[in-house]
Amino acid sequence: MILVPITEVDWDPQRTAAALAGAVADVEAVVGPFDLVLFGNESADAGGFQVGVRVAYALGRPVVNGIKGIDVADGVASARRQIDGGFEVYNVPLPAVLGVKEGINLPRYPTMKGRLASKKAEVVVDERSAGAGGQERVRLHRPVETVSETVILGTGPEAAPAIVDLLEELGVLS
């Protein structure tokens, strides 16, 4: 396990991705490339959907986000993304980066023996600098709320003339 402590500056998605891509590259230089690098689909704080995509780009790997299922065989990851009425399936060559959605797995809780063993596990602290980045919020404002009214123009075929009149008034029909 590698721990990258967050101490010095705000870690925006650009800085976070740079640090993680650097850590992955450093470990891969020793142990060889990982078949899959998995990320959550989005962060809980900013919800930017950026970190996994940025890491994939930095590592030069294909990326698929929004994944609800994964199968790996013969150097290819089949990643399933849920859509209305079914799934989209993406076959990507390994190594790859995937952004997974909540519910992709059922958590396995450690046994007491596993918990005790984890206390002895080595944790490598990577004192990586935040580096370049610095996405800056320029401004944040709430848009003016608009109130819209729903007008029922009738029901069934009797409503057709009223709808045509409204569309002509709006300039949709001429």
Residue ranges and their predicted role:
Residues M1-S174:
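N-terminal glycine-rich FAD/FM-binding segment characteristic of electron-transfer flavoproteins
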